[in-house]
Amino acid sequence: MNSKRTFILLTVALLWIGSGSAMALGNRPGDQPGNRTQVRLTRKDRLWDSHLLKINFIDKSPESAGSKIYHAIIPDPDTYIRSVAREVMRTLYFSPHDSIPECKVLDYILRSDKGISAKGGGNGFVNIFYSSDWVAKSFSNGDTARVDFETRGVLLHELTHAFQLEPQGIGPYGGPNKAVWELIEGMADAVRVAAGGFHGEQDRPKGGSYHDGYRYIGYFFDWVRRNKDKNFIRKMNKSCLEVVPWSWNGAVAYALGPGHDIDALWHEYQVAVGDIKADARP
């Protein structure tokens, strides 16, 4: 990006931030944009925060255009990350008193990378990298709102991996049972969809299968949440504790009641959103 153009666009970004046009850190999913840097925490907010102890923000490319853009839009990364973490936990759990994995240390790393973002670590010590190259690309037309929206959406997904429960009794992520990968990645996108981190219908993948994970499951879960049970995402997350060994049919029956199964539910969803005809075989 041309340095002079970057300076001009960053100046615009800073003026935009100063006008209070960024999204409020204290917002609940679906709230309107406000000021990211000023938030009054409630007692319940602090209870959610107790599951995320220390954040180390590490900028490995401070001279890059992406880094400068990031800091112009997000001047207080610690407050920002904690706010998004609260959104994630509120979407996954009924209460801050639930069995929520504790994140003792989160290393959030801004660096030059061809990938967009990824979560690593475990057992309470988590690292998430976010690409400064991607930030610069998102800002290519001087679109601060796009950077803000994309950064929050990506963080919703990655922080879900830090706080979600994982299926028990069927092996690890990356093992022979693909259902583990399907649920873990699908749940992360379900949280992102439910929290307004995608662009609605235009980002919904058409057709496919719940076995395709990610947005396929994300939009599917959100449809069930909106049309059948507002706590569906929370219950599917909790099924990882209650359904052992975990299975798709067992989890759906746990969430919606006996007699429900994953294939019939997916078929109903596909018909409802117009991806298949009603007389198509499940």
Positions of the model-derived regions?
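Active-site recognition of the HExxH zinc-binding catalytic motif
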Residues: G153-E166, E185-D189
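Surface-exposed patches in mature extracellular/periplasmic domains of secreted proteins
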Residues: M89-I109, I170-A179, G200-K206, N231-S239
